[in-house]
Amino acid sequence: MYYGFDMGGTKIELGVFDENLQRIWHKRVPTPREDYPQLLQILRDLTEEADTYCGVQGSVGIGIPGLPNADDGTVFTANVPSAMGQPLQADLSRLIQREVRIDNDANCFALSEAWDPEFRTYPTVLGLILGTGVGGGLIVNGSIVSGRNHITGEFGHFRLPVDALDILGADIPHVPCGCGHRGCIENYISGRGFEWMYSHFYQHTLPATDIIAHYAAGEPKAVAHVERFMDVLAVCLGNLLTMLDPHLVVVGGGLSNFEKIYQELPKRLPAHLLRVARLPRIEKARYGDSGGVRGAAFLHLAEK
């Protein structure tokens, strides 16, 4: 059995998956804000409850909105203060008497999609999240590529490519990023960036859902904005594809629901790839909100 915890700022969700990778049980509880011992006790209690339900001890994986230290498993996650700076992996492993694996929730998203029955046929899978920010994960032969510092999937912190400046104008502001740098692509091609660019060019603020609705109705500003956004997205993704050369790209996050992306990217990407490059398959994520739990559960499966 495979147990996956999706640990967020407000809730902890546990999903239990059988040997056929089907979810057979799940439970949600609130996340303690500040109390680390309470957090450990909740995770222990949920694990033991799952063991009782299954009649066996399952493997345990945890997805967090942050980064585990690559050397000692210490957790860095501002969204879960009770776990921030704590040796969660070592402490919980000791409490439940089995190895616990922890990874970034974006990597868990990518792993979940890569283990889809159809997608498993692809040797390299790029999970790309276009949500409040931009991130994701790279899966090679069913396993996460984390990198030395566990930041392989931090795609949103690439700087805006020079070709994007041709589209947006050389005077486009280099927006300050939460990472401490300026001009990171997540400030332009995320859902938040989608709204910011509209506001920048038209001095009018609208939520992404309204912009897309205006686009569907043929409103000229919204149409021009979407065209510009798709061009910038193609430039940024083209750079990423040239570097990683995946067989499959799976798109998640709020903007993944904008179907125009899957129509436009295949037409616009070739101009930004090497001539010998073949386009990867580009698909919308299949597992939605359950992807984090699935991917966390499969952190052990990926090592088999």
UniProtKB/Swiss-Prot annotation:
Enzyme superclass (EC): transferase
Pathway annotation: Cell wall biogenesis; peptidoglycan recycling
Annotated PROSITE patterns: ROK
Residue positions binding ATP: 4-11, 133-140
Signal peptide stretch: none
Keywords: ATP-binding, Carbohydrate metabolism, Kinase, Metal-binding, Nucleotide-binding, Transferase, Zinc
Gene Ontology molecular-function annotations: ATP binding; N-acetylglucosamine kinase activity; zinc ion binding
This enzyme's EC code(s): 2.7.1.59
Xref: Gene3D superfamilies: 3.30.420.40
Domain of life: Bacteria
Enzymatic reactions: N-acetyl-D-glucosamine + ATP = N-acetyl-D-glucosamine 6-phosphate + ADP + H(+)
UniProt record, GO biological process: N-acetylglucosamine metabolic process; peptidoglycan turnover
Annotated SUPFAM superfamilies: Actin-like ATPase domain (SSF53067)
Residues reported to bind Zn(2+): 157, 177, 179, 184
Positions of disulphide bridges: none
NCBIfam families (alphabetical): PRK13310.1, PRK13311.1
PANTHER family documented for this protein: N-ACETYL-D-GLUCOSAMINE KINASE, ROK (REPRESSOR, ORF, KINASE) FAMILY
Similarity comment: family membership: Belongs to the ROK (NagC/XylR) family. NagK subfamily.
Function: Catalyzes the phosphorylation of N-acetyl-D-glucosamine (GlcNAc) derived from cell-wall degradation, yielding GlcNAc-6-P.
Protein name: N-acetyl-D-glucosamine kinase
Protein's gene: nagK
